[in-house]
Amino acid sequence: MKIRKLSIQNIASIESADIDFEGGALGEAALFLICGDTGSGKTTILDCITLALYGKTPRYDGSRVKNAQEVGGYAFNDARQLVRHGANSASVTLSLIGNDGRPYEATWAVDAVSRGENKGKLKDESWTWKDCSDGGLTWTKVRDCEEAAQRAVGFEFRQFCRTAMLAQGQFTQFLLGNEDAKAEILEKQIGRAHV
């Protein structure tokens, strides 16, 4: 998979941003590092990539949080917690070339109710995957989007987070992890002959 462009609207501290991974210094890079001061948005960028690809983030992965409590009317593990305070809508769109060589666009979005007693409350989020090649399909059902992500990226959510996007503190967890799980991840990355 090759990430081409990331567009962020009203996610956490980022009001609006477009990151072009094909232009400038990033255009030829096979690997890149996201760095900056504490609070500068590094983790938010990673959250946005996984949100577009998988409809969830490592930070708010519901399967990791037991007995989640509500915060501000949303479950603690609800990705809508990332919506910028006071925003009426939020979205993340990721353009990429999948492992199958096809161009895709993955979008996660949410809007707020515009009137009535629930005005300002966030609606259920939408998640869409689109094959941007000629005659390509668009998927809007969660299961179909999960299958499109698996096809294009080559990893399911947890594998992706453990390999391509080791969030804060997770590198040590990978190094100390189960040998079979590490072998499976490495096999997918570089092939059985090299593992």
What name fits each language-model region?
Residues 164:
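Conserved beta-strand/loop subsegment of P-loop NTPase cores
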Residues 193-195:
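Conserved small/polar residues in nucleotide/adenosyl-binding loops
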Residues 1-143, 147, 157-161:
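Extreme N-terminal "head/tail" segments of very large remodeling/mechanoenzyme assemblies
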Residues 185:
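Catalytic phosphate/metal-binding cores of nucleic-acid and nucleotide-processing enzymes, i.e., regions
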Residues 167:
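Short, small/polar-rich loop/turn modules that mediate ligand/substrate recognition or access, typified
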Residues 174-179:
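Cytochrome P450
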Residues 152-153:
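ATP-hydrolysis module of ASCE/P-loop NTPase motor domains
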